[in-house]
Amino acid sequence: MAQLLTSRQAEELHRALIAYLSSNNLTSTAAALRAEIGLGEDVFDATTAKKYEGLLEKKWTSVVRLQKKVRHTSQLSNATPTSRQNKDPVNWLPKSPARHTLQSHRQPITCVAFHPVFSSLASGSEDQTIKIWDWELGELERTIKGHTKTVLDVDFGGPRGNTLLASCSSDLTIKLWDPSDDYKNIRTLPGHDHSVSAVRFIPSGVAGGAGNLLVSASRDKTLRIWDVSTGYCVKTLRGHAEWVRDVCPSVDGRFILSTSDDYTSRLWDVSIANPEPKTTLIGHEHVVLCCAIAPSASYPHLAAIAGVKKPPTTSAVEFMATGSRDKTIRLWDARGTCIKILVGHDNWVRGLVFHPGGKYLLSASDDYTLRCWDLTQEGRCVKTISDAHAHFVQCIRWAPSVVKDVSVANGGDGQGGEANGTPRQAAGAGAAEAQIRCVLATGSVDLNVRIFAN
């Protein structure tokens, strides 16, 4: 054991063992261990031992959870094409009841995000905490404290092979947490002058990228791009006239879509030194709360809606979706033309996500529902989950697809080779390389996180 652990780690293990034995009334065994290692009552008294109670059990259950996650990832990696086809992931849609209802937050849930590899889900809340769940088991793993006001958004991503969790808050800060080190807060990024409403890791590929870049949106009317390895703000994007609500990077990391209280959405080319809006989307009649960039799998269906005979094949951003307080969803092309208005929600549209298979767009709303819009039927609403939550549905995320190439799976986009829940494919890569996971998470003012899964 001494060869595997440092002297400090061995000492901590011995203390945890003594605390465990003492708390389970195995006093003679605890005394024998004390004598064997020379740890007397004068050095490690009962009061100090109390601090170590439960530590051994916690470490043990963490190892068990990790083993389950490794097995789960291995099973996904080894799944055959036939088994995937039988589950028909391209056509899968969530249905009620949810597989799990996750309860622990004491205030409304504002955001959720999936780990790109493991079955971990992060949720943020007005209770100022982030909670990490095992979405497969439906269990709470830990509670992260650090923000002093509402946690407004969370996202997984970061440098290759080193997944981080980013969070942002009404306390004006962005925080970076290390999942591999018990979610230790490794950096705090100050700089915004008002609440930071959204945060996303930018996929590697953009100049100076390599997965180190993060974009944030704020009530101070700006977007900022950060280098997470240094903590420095490398670019500030100005153009919106009001609060910037949401942000979505393109799969190649070159473009960023933002939404605002100024009733507009803007598409930015962040690969240039001084980014300016490439396209401004004008049409909503109220605050634009959410956005999503369509995956290439959606291009044929959206091109048909737009009246284009041949779907585009080159650009990373050809079609987009935005949701608003005007209760509508708008579909746009890259030129800023609204190609379709989706009407059906009875209240604010809070969240959007494209189905990784490309056929559907899913939305979450303050009308307590989730809606599924079929892009092969010109955006017709083909499914409504009317009992999704008992209050406003504030966020929605799709689990990232499993990418066979681990170097891509741990890429800098924060979603296992995805952006906004849609599969990221390298040039020349086929759809088979990204295995769709039929898992969806939502969060609500009813204090619940819900997991919808196949």
From Swiss-Prot:
InterPro entries recorded:
Dynein_regulator_LIS1, G-protein_beta_WD-40_rep, LIS1_N, LisH, PAC1-like_LisH-like_dom, WD40/YVTN_repeat-like_dom_sf, WD40_repeat_CS, WD40_repeat_dom_sf
WD repeats: which residues?
104-145, 147-187, 191-236, 239-278, 283-342, 344-383, 388-450
Name where it's found: Cytoplasm, Cytoskeleton; Cytoplasm, Cytoskeleton, Spindle pole
Q: Which residues form the LisH domain?
A: 9-41
Q: Name one Pfam family in it.
A: WD40
The entry's keywords = Cell cycle, Cell division, Coiled coil, Cytoplasm, Cytoskeleton, Microtubule, Mitosis, Repeat, Transport, WD repeat
What is stated about domains?
Dimerization mediated by the LisH domain may be required to activate dynein.
Q: Which gene encodes it?
A: PAC1-1
> Quaternary form?
Self-associates. Interacts with NDL1 and dynein.
SMART domains in the record, alphabetically?
Answer: WD40
Family, per the entry?
Answer: Belongs to the WD repeat LIS1/nudF family.
Gene3D superfamilies associated with the record? 1.20.960.30, YVTN repeat-like/Quinoprotein amine dehydrogenase
Asked if the keyword tRNA processing belongs to this entry, the reply reads no
Q: What is this protein called?
A: Nuclear distribution protein PAC1-1
Keyword set includes Cell cycle: yes
Kindly give the CDD domains that the UniProt entry links to this protein: WD40
Q: Which GO terms describe its cellular component?
A: cytoplasm; microtubule; microtubule associated complex; spindle pole
- Disordered, as annotated region: 71-93
Comp. bias intervals (Polar residues) = 73-84
Q: Which cysteines are joined by disulfide bonds?
A: none
Q: What is the recorded function of this protein according to its Swiss-Prot or TrEMBL entry?
A: Positively regulates the activity of the minus-end directed microtubule motor protein dynein. May enhance dynein-mediated microtubule sliding by targeting dynein to the microtubule plus end. Required for nuclear migration during vegetative growth as well as development. Required for retrograde early endosome (EE) transport from the hyphal tip. Required for localization of dynein to the mitotic spindle poles. Recruits additional proteins to the dynein complex at SPBs.
Gene Ontology process terms (BP): cell division; establishment of mitotic spindle orientation; microtubule sliding
Instruction: Specify the taxonomic lineage.
Output: Eukaryota, Fungi, Dikarya, Ascomycota, Pezizomycotina
